[in-house]
Amino acid sequence: MQLVVVGAHQRTAPISIRERIAFAEAELAQALSSLRQIAVEGFILSTCNRVELYALVEEADGGRSLRQFLAQQRSIDLDELMPHVYTYLDEDAVRHLFRVASGLDSMALGEAQILSQIKTAYNAAQQTELLGTTMHRLIQAALTTGKLVRTETQLAHAQLSVVSVGLSLARQHLDLTNRSVVIIGAGRTGELALKHYLEYTSNITVLSRTFERAARLAEHHKVAAKPISELAAVLQASDVVISCTSSPELMLDFEQAQLLQAQRQRQWVLLDLAVPRDIDRHVGALPEVWLYDVDDMQAICERNRASKAAEVAGAEAIVERELIKWQEWWLTQAVLPTIRALRAHAEAIRLAELERTLARLDLSEQQQQAVSALTSAIINKLLHQPMRAIKDTAASPQLAHAAQQLFRLDFEAI
């Protein structure tokens, strides 16, 4: 078995590529079902900054199959995709996921939202029955690593997020006090944006393609909510727009923005936090319009990364520590078939000899149970040390191979 991850993120692929390969939440079930054709287990992690396929495969070159799968699923030419994707195998794949969960690989160093995004990926894979023992253990280990990094280091303290970076950019152009802010999207990012901007203004309107979600979020924070059908009117009155939907279609195209800005005739800050993008990239060329997408925010995040070198080193040490624990578990899995076969072999002999012996003796049921318990205890004590030795030397499985040959173990009989 080979553990493989194939993916692209904000440092390897521009948003023009990432938005073409991103999976909307509604698309995950079909994609995961198709992934079953090449993977024994797997899951898909798709966020605004990364798209990654994790798979446990039987073939030797699982990376090639996953790259082809991604290209086919997203209808993008493989040659166009290849310069932007990375492939990690086995230990490197596990290390990568642990770093992702820790916020070390995020655009906003230490950001915590990735943990909930990994949980979402886990739930989607679980619903399509694509999670087995290995992937379940891997994801749980990654989440544990992420939590340890956040509790044992200062990495998450005063952390930047895409939302907070966007806020700082907006403040470079406008005094946000009592400004009209529009948030398009009522998911996690939308709620995070709402909490940030409430520190400056209560004149906030939330819109969503599902009005009920916008209404619930707005009611909870005592701001306004509008149906998406009123988007144009709401935008006309706005000073700052934060768009963070998962829509495959643009929420604001160039013609709409041009018409609105001609009517507004004042400064307009547009923060597009969505992948695929919600706002036509040409809108930023309009007079007095400042448009920023997630890639524009990366330089600020990189400066933040450089200032946290000590925290990063501590987090990396935790990742390596947890990776060792994973490797110990993983190596043990490789010898488990031998251990199970050895126990099954011993149990088969015990039962056969017990049956033969009991047939010759006139014992009560209680006596028969006592003899059976005695033979089980003998077998358990005889096997305890050999099985412990096989587990302890899993990294160098000579003992496992020797046991297979000595006892002529039948793995099909397990």
From Swiss-Prot:
CDD domains xref list: NAD_bind_Glutamyl_tRNA_reduct (cd05213)
Catalysed conversion reaction: (S)-4-amino-5-oxopentanoate + tRNA(Glu) + NADP(+) = L-glutamyl-tRNA(Glu) + NADPH + H(+)
Catalytic center residues: C48
Residues annotated to bind substrate: T47, C48, N49, R50, S106, E111, A112, Q113, Q117
Keyword Oxidoreductase among record annotations: yes
Keyword NADP set for record: yes
Source domain of life: Bacteria
Known EC number: 1.2.1.70
Signal sequence extent: none
Pathway: Porphyrin-containing compound metabolism; protoporphyrin-IX biosynthesis; 5-aminolevulinate from L-glutamyl-tRNA(Glu): step 1/2
GO molecular function, one term: glutamyl-tRNA reductase activity
Residues with site note (Important for activity): H96
BP-aspect Gene Ontology terms: protoporphyrinogen IX biosynthetic process from glutamate
Binding site for NADP(+): G185, A186, G187, R188, T189, G190
UniProtKB keywords: NADP, Oxidoreductase, Porphyrin biosynthesis
Pfam families assigned to the protein according to its UniProt record, in alphabetical order: GlutR_dimer (PF00745), GlutR_N (PF05201), Shikimate_DH (PF01488)
Gene3D superfamilies for the chain: Glutamyl-tRNA reductase, N-terminal domain (3.30.460.30), NAD(P)-binding Rossmann-like Domain (3.40.50.720)
Family: Belongs to the glutamyl-tRNA reductase family.
NCBIfam families (alphabetical): hemA (TIGR01035)
Subunit structure: Homodimer.
Note: During catalysis, the active site Cys acts as a nucleophile attacking the alpha-carbonyl group of tRNA-bound glutamate with the formation of a thioester intermediate between enzyme and glutamate, and the concomitant release of tRNA(Glu). The thioester intermediate is finally reduced by direct hydride transfer from NADPH, to form the product GSA.
Entry's free-text remark on domains: Possesses an unusual extended V-shaped dimeric structure with each monomer consisting of three distinct domains arranged along a curved 'spinal' alpha-helix. The N-terminal catalytic domain specifically recognizes the glutamate moiety of the substrate. The second domain is the NADPH-binding domain, and the third C-terminal domain is responsible for dimerization.
Record PANTHER family: GLUTAMYL-TRNA REDUCTASE
Reported function: Catalyzes the NADPH-dependent reduction of glutamyl-tRNA(Glu) to glutamate 1-semialdehyde (GSA).
Record-given protein name: Glutamyl-tRNA reductase
Source species: Herpetosiphon aurantiacus (strain ATCC 23779 / DSM 785 / 114-95)
Encoding gene, per UniProt annotation: hemA
